[in-house]
Structures are given as C-alpha cells and as structure tokens.
A protein has these predicted regions:
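Residue-level detector of alpha-helical secondary structure
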Residues: 206, 210-213
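Collagenous Gly-X-Y triple-helix signature in extracellular proteins
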Residues: 1-196, 205
Length: 215
C-alpha cells in the first residue's frame, strides 16, 4: 500500500492518531486548552536512567542522564529552525509509587511519560521492540523502610506491561511533549493510500499501457 501524506493541524488528528512533525513520528494522546499531549512513536535512543551513585536522589528524573539528552534534542530542533514556542511547557509529577513527593513537580518542554500517564493512555500507545523508561520512581529514599527497590524506576516492557528496574539499566527513551493544536503536521491520507498499482490486475494494467502507447 502506498503511503501518501497530507498536511493537517494537530487539533484535527484524533487521539491515538499517528502523525509526523519535526522529522519524527508521534502518537497524539490527548488535548486541552493548552495544547496537545504527544508521545514519540518510537524509541529515540537507549541509555541508563542514571549513571554513578547518588544516595540522596538515585532515581530523580531531574538529576538523570536522560534530561541532558532531551535538552540536546530540544536544542537540535530549535537549531534547525523550529521556534521554541512550538514546545509548550508541561508539568511532570515525580511522585513515587507509595505517594512520596520529595522529588516534587517540575516543568519542562520535553520529558518522559509518568506511570499515571501511561496508565491513562496505554490503549493509544503503540508497543515497541524494547523496554522504555517512565519518569516515575518506584520508591524514594524517604519512603517506608519496608519498601523494596527504592532506587528503581518504572519502565514499560515490550508487551506493554509496567515494571521497575535499577536506574543504571539501559532502556529506551521515548519522549513526551506538548504541541499547539494549530501546529501543521503530516498524516497518512488513507483515502488516497487505498490505491496501489499492486492491486491492479496485470491484464488490466497491460491493456491500459497498450491503449496509451497506441493512442
């Protein structure tokens, strides 16, 4: 099936729809008066959540290796001509599984989906062939001493299930962003894509070629 793209505004893409913008493919998760929440359709890179030891904040996204990587991605987009205003700030709640809030909420223009966000939108999110990080810590240093894995971070496995892993494991990075609903994006034109020469019987195709060359 041929893939023909057409331009539409992001506001006209349905939730769960796949679109292309900034040279990347995304899935639209939700929309409100602020903009459209989107997730990368694919993993952009694989890396540890955190390298080295940090007993105070071992699984805090703000102090992770992932945030500098995402910052570089944002800088590359703007360097290539995309206005910074295209990336609407979004708030990421770093509350852990037990309800501890010591990492707080921080505002970024590009980040990771939280466990709560994944729980809300998982039906819309395409599975990928490698595990990928979420923003949510499993536990934090100030959680109950009876809580295990207080240095772990939640991630999504290839089958779509959630689990927790040590922060220095190497998993996928699948960014979440918020774009304006007025952003022009590209989507597949399903109506046009239905036509393909591969679906035309060979005899009909040869007859058409003959009629055009003899006319």
């Amino acid at each position: 099936m041929s893939k023909i793209l057409k331009s539409v505004t992001l506001g006209n893409v349905k939730n769960g729809g796949i679109f292309k913008a900034l040279g990347k493919e995304f899935v639209k998760l939700d929309a409100d008066e602020h903009g459209c929440l989107v997730l990368a359709k694919d993993i952009w890179t694989k890396m540890p959540f955190r390298e080295g030891d940090d007993p105070e904040c071992p699984n805090d996204l703000r102090r992770s290796e992932i945030m500098p990587y995402l910052g570089n991605c944002l800088a590359e987009f703007t360097k290539n001509g995309t206005p910074l205003s295209t990336f609407i700030p979004l708030r990421i709640d770093l509350q852990d599984t037990t309800g501890q809030n010591e990492y707080g909420i921080f505002e970024v223009r590009i980040g990771l989906l939280t466990l709560r966000g994944y729980g809300k939108y998982w039906r819309l999110i395409p599975k990928v062939d490698a595990p990928w990080w979420l923003a949510t810590p499993y536990g934090t240093p100030n959680c109950s001493p009876y809580t295990c894995n207080d240095s772990d971070v939640w991630y999504v496995d290839t089958d779509g299930s959630g689990s927790d892993g040590w922060y220095n494991f190497s998993y996928g990075v699948r960014p979440v962003l918020c774009f304006s609903s007025a952003l022009l994006v590209s989507v597949e034109d399903e109506r046009e894509a239905r036509f393909s020469l591969a679906n035309v019987p060979l005899d009909d195709l040869l007859a058409e070629i003959k009629s055009r060359t003899e006319g």
